[in-house]
Amino acid sequence: MAEQDTLVMPIAEMARSNDKFREVVWTGDNSQLVLMAIPEGGEIGGETHDGHDQLLYFVDGMGKAKIGDKEMDISAGDVAIVPSGKYHNFKNTGTGMMRLYTTYSPPEHEPGTEHDTKADAEADPNED
């Protein structure tokens, strides 16, 4: 899917039908909207975004969130807030796909980025 030029979209529905590890939906000057899907037993991968705040909105599945030194259960309907510079990781501990949409401020990924799998994301030279 190409980036959207529409400013209103059914994002929860889009997230529930997404099977890609990462798909950038919209990129603005100061923020970015991204769909993600984490397979059963998978994880986003521990990381820190210096200079980027991130909000993650979970629409399907369940898992564990680690933000800083705190670990919490997450499930559909939850939001996780990750301030700039804070270590974080999200693991799918349920059955089936864990799906979410996330916002970055400012943008974190190249506009139009798509990764079918986490391995694709790790192999992308534009990802750090």
PLM segments and residue spans:
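A short, N-terminal "cap"/entry segment at the start of jelly-roll beta-barrel domains
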Residues: 1-31, 45, 115-128
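Conserved short histidine dyad/triad with adjacent acidic residue
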Residues: 19, 34-49
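Short, charged/polar surface micro-motifs in flexible loops or helix N-caps
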Residues: 29-31, 40-43, 62-64, 106-110
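A generic "binding-loop/recognition-motif" signal
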Residues: 31, 40, 51, 70, ...
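Histidine-centered metal-chelating micro-motifs
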Residues: 43-45, 64, 80, 84-90
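Glycine- and acidic-residue-biased ligand/ion/polar-headgroup-sensing regions
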Residues: 52-63
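Short acidic-glycine-tyrosine-enriched beta hairpin
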Residues: 70-84
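Ligand-binding loop in jelly-roll beta-barrel domains
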Residues: 84-110
